[in-house]
């Protein structure tokens, strides 16, 4: 029965960093924190990683 607790804690520690990547970027501060810039439309060498909280302003990061 103790192996279940060990397995659960191991999976919790192993999968917890993945929650960082699933959080949405929806404000300018988190955009800059993740290495992006707030731009109206992402230029060719950039990709969209979120929004900057306003309607059509996107958070773009270099590919």
Curated annotation (Swiss-Prot):
Modified residues (Pyrrolidone carboxylic acid): 23
SUPFAM superfamilies: Defensin-like
CC annotations in GO: extracellular space
Classification via InterPro entries: Defensin_beta-like (IPR001855)
Subcellular location: Secreted
GO biological process, one term: defense response to Gram-positive bacterium
Bridged cysteine pairs (disulfide): 31-59, 38-52, 42-60
Domain of life: Eukaryota
Major place of residence: secreted
GO terms, molecular function: CCR6 chemokine receptor binding; chemoattractant activity; phosphatidylinositol-4,5-bisphosphate binding
Keywords carried by this UniProt record: Antibiotic, Antimicrobial, Defensin, Disulfide bond, Pyrrolidone carboxylic acid, Secreted, Signal
Signal peptide: 1-22
Function recorded in the entry: Has antibacterial activity.
Similarity remark: Belongs to the beta-defensin family.
Official protein name in the record: Beta-defensin 5
Gene, per the UniProt record: Defb5
């Amino acid at each position: 029965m103790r192996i279940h607790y060990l397995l659960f804690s191991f999976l919790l520690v192993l999968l917890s960093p993945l929650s960082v990547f699933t959080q949405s970027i929806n404000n300018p501060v988190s955009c800059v924190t993740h290495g992006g810039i707030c731009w109206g439309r992402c230029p060719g060498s950039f990709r969209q990683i979120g929004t900057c909280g306003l309607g059509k302003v996107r958070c773009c990061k270099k590919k």
